[in-house]
């Protein structure tokens, strides 16, 4: 449930309409063997995902599952990842960093992850504000709660935050809720604070600088994914190249035409076309349509005529759908 709700909330926070969202799921589980407890983990996860999809009217249109995440005595942690997609105009996309001081910050959503009607109502209110141009920034609350969201929204531009003393800020998970920096005050949402220009985050009587929080946050994985290299006193060698320009006659070179047929399940046709063009050829991508018998017949005729015009046929690989043309 939390995975579905979280993914939808993230794309809603970005400015999309939840009613236009589709999902795809990625699952990783240990080898099930003949053990009921192992079978129960993916079964429970998928039942929860289905309940959330029905509650939010969001269909999963594809996905990938793996039930072989075991090597010797090591098991992968039970995992279900939800990806949400929806169309939205580029100019209407909302980013998550606080934009300016003096703006009110509101919370939209329900504390209960499975209160789908309350979530949808809150998301509709929020989306209407997005359409009206009143949302400056937004963050979909995840496992770190509201406190994490406010902290990371402050990192982008160094804009501070002061909490509303009447608001109950959460440090625990609050999947589905959206923190939004608005350009004006409104009714119908919880006011949790205001953006500030002092470079600090203030909760009640506690104040911490954004710089200190950022340093602590980035230091967690610095040893795993270092962002800085070791300093060295060695002089950096200087490289130079001297060459003479000369005029060469224009020589026309024939470019072989390469036919790249795209079957159901084929992928990497664009990579193949780039490789052909980099080698001096002319790529011609032709999609083999098979929705109807007439489509197949026309595709055969098209490919036949294209073959007659080409010097090469390049068949790209495929590992999805029907694994064509070798499936």
Model-predicted regions and their roles:
Residues 1, 37, 42-44, 59-174, ...:
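Intein/HINT protein-splicing elements and their conserved insertion hotspots or analogous self-processing inserts
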Residues 2-69:
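A glycine-rich phosphate/pyrophosphate-binding beta-strand-loop-alpha-helix module
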Residues 3-16, 49, 53, 115-128, ...:
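Structured alpha-helical segments in the cores of large, soluble enzyme domains
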Residues 15, 102, 180:
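Residue-level signal for inorganic ion chemistry
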Residues 72, 270, 324-326:
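Short glycine-/acidic-enriched loop or helix-start segments at secondary-structure transitions
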Residues 106, 179-181, 314-316:
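Structural motif
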Residues 255, 259-280, 285:
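Glycine-rich phosphate/diphosphate-binding loop of Rossmann-like nucleotide-binding domains
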Residues 275-278, 282-327:
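Flexible gly/pro-rich beta->alpha loop and the following alpha-helix that scaffold active-site loops
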